[in-house]
């Protein structure tokens, strides 16, 4: 029996390698900012999710250091024991007020927040209907939950409506993302929200890549489309420059999650110093509009300079995919850019569908016009 596990592991690794899909962790020596250092060499970083440039901000670092001085290193317990402190409560209140909800519940990651909602909310006889390109955390939770799961074609409102009308399950939960992380495109939230309400279903939006970047003062995609879903998930590992997540909902749903969401109940709470730093990151997002303005300008520059380049997808976000096709060519292009001092990651199946391997270029407010020019010139030469 023990040998069966070893054989399974060996076989899986061999097949992954033969398919050219093996991934490796890279040791970053000096931070994950607009420049990074690997094996003693400096690269322009176009692979991170630090959209507003807060991850390396000295102002935010000082806020975390202040939190450490005030509250120590760790929370010491789960939230329902003694791990929930004033910085956690303050952050939840600030998020709820900012995003227009009654309640917020903190989690240690966006992955755990998404799974916690689906696992705690869905029961046998329920239905969850998800966009076909939703994040792995949502898809996995939907498959493993006791509910019936269906997928609607990407951003296809009519298909969602058809699935909901044909369903005999009740209740139904519709789940989508605000910004899709691999294509950088937006979900048609207004239409999806309308169809969901017409079919008496609940609507959940994961706005990991929109919150902080889009909408009034960075409130995200729901603000951009002027909708209020039943459940909103925001994460802190992108525009906030830190880590963690929160689920926004009404008070009763928040109480329910606090009681039944096992990822929340049985996990050590995030350090209070981190919550303190996140509150400061939130104030920076709200007040430092120049970061979003600069990001927009860099985005326009990137697309203008690559307007004739095959495979470049135009987006309203700092995520700029360049569709290559096969994995080998995508890896070769990524390696060639690294030789020129630019770090771009080749995204391959199973993360994206077969035949759509790509470079996932991401921009940050910490980049300069010169940085973008260097990248676009290099891509033009190599393509």
Curated annotation (Swiss-Prot):
Gene3D superfamilies: Aspartate Aminotransferase, domain 1 (3.90.1150.10), Type I PLP-dependent aspartate aminotransferase-like (Major domain) (3.40.640.10). Its cofactor is pyridoxal 5'-phosphate. Pfam families: Aminotran_1_2 (PF00155). Substrate binds at residues 23, 135, 351. The keyword Transferase applies. It catalyses: 6-carboxyhexanoyl-[ACP] + L-alanine + H(+) = (8S)-8-amino-7-oxononanoate + holo-[ACP] + CO2. Keywords: Biotin biosynthesis, Pyridoxal phosphate, Transferase. InterPro entries: Aminotrans_II_pyridoxalP_BS (IPR001917), Aminotransferase_I/II_large (IPR004839), AON_synthase_class-II (IPR050087), AONS_Archaea/Proteobacteria (IPR004723), AONS_Proteobacteria (IPR022834), PyrdxlP-dep_Trfase (IPR015424), PyrdxlP-dep_Trfase_major (IPR015421), PyrdxlP-dep_Trfase_small (IPR015422). Pathway: Cofactor biosynthesis; biotin biosynthesis. Pyridoxal 5'-phosphate binds at residues 110-111, 181, 209, 235. SUPFAM superfamilies: PLP-dependent transferases (SSF53383). It is an enzyme of class 2 (transferase). One of its GO terms (molecular function) is 8-amino-7-oxononanoate synthase activity. Its EC number is 2.3.1.47. It comes from the Bacteria. One of its GO terms (biological process) is biotin biosynthetic process. The modification N6-(pyridoxal phosphate)lysine is found at residue 238. The keyword Transmembrane helix does not apply. Homodimer. Catalyzes the decarboxylative condensation of pimeloyl-[acyl-carrier protein] and L-alanine to produce 8-amino-7-oxononanoate (AON), [acyl-carrier protein], and carbon dioxide. Belongs to the class-II pyridoxal-phosphate-dependent aminotransferase family. BioF subfamily. This is 8-amino-7-oxononanoate synthase. It comes from Aliivibrio salmonicida (strain LFI1238) (Vibrio salmonicida (strain LFI1238)).
């Amino acid at each position: 029996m023990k040998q069966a596990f070893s054989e399974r592991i060996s076989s899986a690794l061999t097949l992954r390698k033969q398919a050219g899909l093996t991934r490796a962790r890279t040791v970053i020596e000096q931070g994950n900012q607009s420049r990074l250092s690997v094996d003693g060499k400096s690269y322009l970083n176009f692979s991170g999710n630090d959209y507003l440039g807060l991850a390396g901000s000295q102002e935010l670092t000082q806020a975390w250091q202040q939190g450490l001085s005030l509250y120590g290193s760790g929370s010491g317990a789960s939230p329902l024991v003694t791990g929930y402190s004033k910085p956690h409560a303050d952050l939840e209140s600030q998020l709820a007020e900012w995003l227009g909800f009654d309640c917020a519940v903190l989690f240690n990651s966006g992955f755990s927040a998404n799974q916690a909602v689906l696992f705690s909310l869905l029961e046998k006889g329920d239905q969850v209907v998800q966009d076909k390109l939703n994040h792995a955390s949502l898809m996995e939770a939907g498959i493993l939950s006791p509910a019936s799961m269906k997928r609607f074609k990407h951003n296809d409102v009519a298909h969602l409506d058809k699935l909901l009308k044909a369903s005999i399950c009740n209740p139904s939960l519709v789940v989508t993302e605000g910004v899709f992380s691999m294509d950088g495109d937006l979900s048609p939230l207004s239409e999806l929200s309308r169809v969901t309400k017409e079919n008496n279903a609940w609507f959940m939006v994961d706005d990991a890549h929109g919150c902080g970047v889009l909408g009034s003062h960075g409130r995200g995609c729901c603000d951009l489309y002027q909708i209020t879903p039943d459940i909103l998930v925001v994460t802190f590992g992108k525009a906030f420059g830190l880590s963690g997540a929160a689920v926004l909902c009404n008070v009763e749903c928040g109480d329910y999650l606090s009681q039944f969401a096992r990822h929340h109940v049985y996990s050590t709470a995030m350090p209070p110093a981190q919550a303190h730093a996140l509150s400061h990151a939130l104030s920076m997002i709200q007040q430092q509009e120049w970061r979003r303005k600069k990001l927009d300008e860099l985005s326009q520059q990137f697309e203008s300079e690559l307007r004739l380049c095959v495979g470049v997808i135009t987006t309203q976000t700092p995520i700029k995919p360049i569709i290559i096709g096969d994995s080998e060519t995508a890896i070769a292009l990524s390696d060639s850019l690294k030789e020129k001092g630019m770090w771009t990651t080749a995204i391959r199946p199973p993360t994206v569908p077969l035949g759509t391997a790509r470079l996932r270029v991401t921009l940050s407010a910490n980049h300069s016009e010169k940085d973008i020019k260097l990248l676009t010139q290099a891509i033009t030469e190599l393509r």
